[in-house]
Amino acid sequence: MKRSGTLRLLSDLSAFGGAARLRELVAGDSAVRVRGSPDGRHLLLLRPPGAVAPQLLVASRGPGAELERAWPAGQPSPLDAFFLPWPARPALVLVWESGLAEVWGAGVGPGWRPLQSTELCPGGGARVVAVAALRGRLVWCEERQARAEGPSGSPAAAFSHCVCVRTLEPSGEASTSLGRTHVLLHHCPAFGLLASCRQLFLVPTATTWPGVAHVLLIWSPGKGKVMVAAPRLGLSYSKSLNPGRGDTWDFRTLLRGLPGLLSPREPLAVHTWAPTPQGLLLLDFGGTVSLLQSHGGTRAVGTLQEAPVGPWGSAALGTFQGTLACVLGSTLELLDMGSGQLLERKVLSTDRVHLLEPPAPGMEDEEELETRGNLRLLSALGLFCVGWEAPQGVELPSAKDLVFEEACGYYQRRSLRGAQLTPEELRHSSTFRAPQALASILQGHLPPSALLTMLRTELRDYRGLEQLKAQLVAGDDEEAGWTELAEQEVARLLRTELIGDQLAQLNTVFQALPTAAWGATLRALQLQLDGNGKLRSQAPPDVWKKVLGGITAGKEPPNGILPPFELLCQCLCQLEPRWLPPFVELAQQQGGPGWGAGGPGLPLYRRALAVLGEEGTRPEALELELLLSSGRPKAVLQAVGQLVQKEQWDRALDAGLALGPSSPLLRSEIFKLLLAEFAQHRRLDAHLPLLCRLCPPELAPAELLLLLRTYLPDEVGPPTPFPEPGAEPPLTVGLLKALLEQTGAQGWLSGPVLSPYEDILWDPSTPPPTPPRDL
């Protein structure tokens, strides 16, 4: 029975937030750029720069707020926008001509919110002319100061562009990880960028230098290759282009080394480009559709019954199930990809139609499983599915049905009874549990494509490691190779459960290449200094949980194997000792219950001190900083005691004054410790103003005098008006007056008289009454 093409209505757009605005933009602006998210739940509409507001609309199906942005006149709007293929949550990236890139995410809070902002062209003077998103990478073509190299229209100005790439991956629940910028091509013409699921196509534009406007490039990041093709010449060449190995090409040098590519040839006359999983579709002005494949070869697909109406006529191309779909104005044509035969032609009710790629495999909703692999068509009337209608009467059994049918035959062969078993009996009988268990597993199973999407990061890392190992075996740039290998291995290990062999491997990497290992940890924890010189981290809690985890009872590692936190402290002691106290302080802020901070077991500062060695052999400066920054009362008192022994009065007083109002008892203990020194000798007299500031506000003058009496040294003889030569001067009332005034002032301000010394301190103008004289 002959199949027929169908347009099945998936949604009338009422299920999308902001449906009225969505219909208005689709129906009113033919130049609007439309993209669908990988999960099929979001639609992105972007008007070209200079269009009326709003320029950006992201409509979401079901729960979830839409995103609508407008930029006022004089302020540039985004050059392009893309959804990112992140399985955990929807995300999109906006790129401006100036090089500004913003990453927005949903699902981590109410509505859409910005996750990160970065500059793609930090040096200034550059202009982004094209951008594309390719499987966790952001690729852009930028123009670099063409006017400085030559006048407009000159070869120097025409080859003043470069193509750059930067990795863009999710990191934790609400952050992103941006890699370093790599230059793929420099001194190249202006290229348009089109991305499919595996390749990036660099195509000529209207401003490309005519002498090279017949050349296209196909970059395959997974293979680390770039294909240079000239379809009209029938030539294609393959070259290595792997940013991970530092590969880069000068475009002019690249073409000079490929015979025949610079032969005089007219530029490609292409009306519409369309990337597909099979390659790049080219529609010329005569209505002929060709396919440029990943190996550089070109083949004709077929000729449409209608040709594009001029260069500005709308056209959209796509493929599904071996079929080419082309929308020209209000006409939809379906051609067989193999033979080029016209299969069906439909006249649509509107010419404002946009073709959308199907959702990524494994990310579809349950309602869309029936339309898997089919194209989607968006108009103001709704969202439609373009596909083939299967012949009536043909219904494929589900995986659950196949399980029970296969089990039925298996049990029937082993059964001794003559009655015939049926699949329905196996479904409801409690005797046959194996097929029921298998059917329940299959009901919630993930397809291989979804599993591959989830494991893509790990697979990419493993592949990169294997390539790097091969490079090291070959002896190419060993120092940089070992550094990159260590960084990748540490990043991989931090994503695993750090026990057993993984923990031993992490220790080995830190011992062999500590600098590279610490650099990888620095990026994993996203450590950076703020304006006050304090360490800050944007890493998600699960990363810190692995780093701060201690030793579980019964799972002690072998001798010489350190837990991750101790390993990082040891590495910092070797590389940057001054970073150790701020790192431990930050770790204590990040730790949760049972992580090694704030839970049972040794506190983090004591674990860090254990790395420094036994007591008495540790570096004194580091030990003091760790104790002071720990925030633990015993540790701070121990540090202040050591400072007092060394007579470092300023640091001891600063340690007490640095404590906030939330630590009154600790401040009081430090004050008493220093007050005892003040009572016994005069080496603290120069710091009396700071000691007065440290005085507890609730301390009354009488209590102060009682404390001083406790700390005063015992008198060994009768009192004398003057100290012996060479002896320590005693405490005088003049020195004590400042402290008494401090406590008296606080007591006066707090309310009633707190001691019998208040009248002396606060009313010196009124002398006491004269005692009567004995006559």
Curated annotation (Swiss-Prot):
One of its GO terms (cellular component) is BLOC-2 complex. Its main location: membrane. Pfam families: HPS6, HPS6_C. GO terms for molecular function: GTP-dependent protein binding; small GTPase binding. Keywords: Albinism, Cytoplasm, Endoplasmic reticulum, Endosome, Hermansky-Pudlak syndrome, Lysosome, Membrane, Microsome. One of its GO terms (biological process) is lipid homeostasis. Ubiquitous. It comes from the Eukaryota. Signal peptide: none annotated. The keyword Membrane applies. It is found in: Microsome membrane; Cytoplasm, Cytosol; Early endosome membrane; Lysosome membrane. The keyword Cell membrane does not apply. May regulate the synthesis and function of lysosomes and of highly specialized organelles, such as melanosomes and platelet dense granules. Acts as a cargo adapter for the dynein-dynactin motor complex to mediate the transport of lysosomes from the cell periphery to the perinuclear region. Facilitates retrograde lysosomal trafficking by linking the motor complex to lysosomes, and perinuclear positioning of lysosomes is crucial for the delivery of endocytic cargos to lysosomes, for lysosome maturation and functioning. Component of the biogenesis of lysosome-related organelles complex-2 (or BLOC2) composed of HPS3, HPS5 and HPS6. Interacts with HPS5 and HPS3. Interacts with biogenesis of lysosome-related organelles complex-1 (BLOC1). Interacts with AP-3 complex. Interacts with MNAT1. Interacts with DCTN1 and dynein intermediate chain. It is linked to Hermansky-Pudlak syndrome 6: A form of Hermansky-Pudlak syndrome, a genetically heterogeneous autosomal recessive disorder characterized by oculocutaneous albinism, bleeding due to platelet storage pool deficiency, and lysosomal storage defects. This syndrome results from defects of diverse cytoplasmic organelles including melanosomes, platelet dense granules and lysosomes. Ceroid storage in the lungs is associated with pulmonary fibrosis, a common cause of premature death in individuals with HPS. This is BLOC-2 complex member HPS6. The gene is HPS6.
